[in-house]
């Protein structure tokens, strides 16, 4: 028996800790193998001893900037057009062909981002990032280690989705086809 509808995805890839060209290549490979059914889920990545045993913490701000660059390169490499990039952390000389072959989904497999809403803060950078892509893993700041989702109440989720809708509208996009996971 084989499935034809189930999607494959990551929960959660700390993309800032990956080389964007390697990540794009791996996601494209799985997309082709699955017949176009992969989704890339990304976030900054929680810090814990396992990560810190291999690398120093660069801080949230650096990881956030790296994540934005990784996603820019990911979209550019898988977009089916010649691509080059120069950023603070990553660069790519003009690329005209990606090996392995391009993904099935165009312009690229969808990206779902953690969208953290911090109550009382006017600028929500995590939500701004999530609004630029195809879906969000909603999170509300203020949970505890024992109950990390404790602040994700129905009214808080409604506010988060409304903010995402406003951000997408500012960019000329709608919420149609946008996933809230």
Residue ranges and their predicted role:
Residues 1-181:
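Active-site-adjacent structural elements that line small-molecule/cofactor binding pockets in enzymes
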């Amino acid at each position: 028996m084989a499935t034809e509808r189930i999607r494959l995805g990551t929960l959660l890839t700390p993309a800032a800790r990956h080389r964007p060209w390697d990540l794009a290549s791996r996601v494209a490979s799985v997309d082709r193998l699955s017949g176009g059914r992969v989704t890339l889920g990304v976030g900054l990545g929680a810090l814990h001893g396992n990560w810190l045993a291999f690398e120093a913490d660069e801080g949230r701000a650096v990881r956030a900037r790296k994540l934005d660059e990784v996603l820019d390169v990911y979209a550019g490499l898988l977009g089916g057009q010649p691509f080059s990039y120069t950023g603070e952390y990553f660069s790519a000389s003009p690329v005209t062909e990606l090996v392995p072959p391009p993904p099935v989904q165009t312009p690229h497999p969808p990206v779902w981002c953690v969208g953290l809403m911090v109550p009382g803060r006017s600028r929500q950078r995590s939500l701004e990032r999530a609004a630029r892509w195809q879906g969000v893993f909603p999170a509300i700041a203020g949970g505890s280690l024992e109950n990390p989702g404790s602040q994700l109440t129905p009214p808080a989720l409604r506010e988060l989705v409304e903010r995402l809708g406003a951000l997408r509208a500012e960019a000329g996009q709608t919420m149609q086809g946008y996933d809230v996971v």
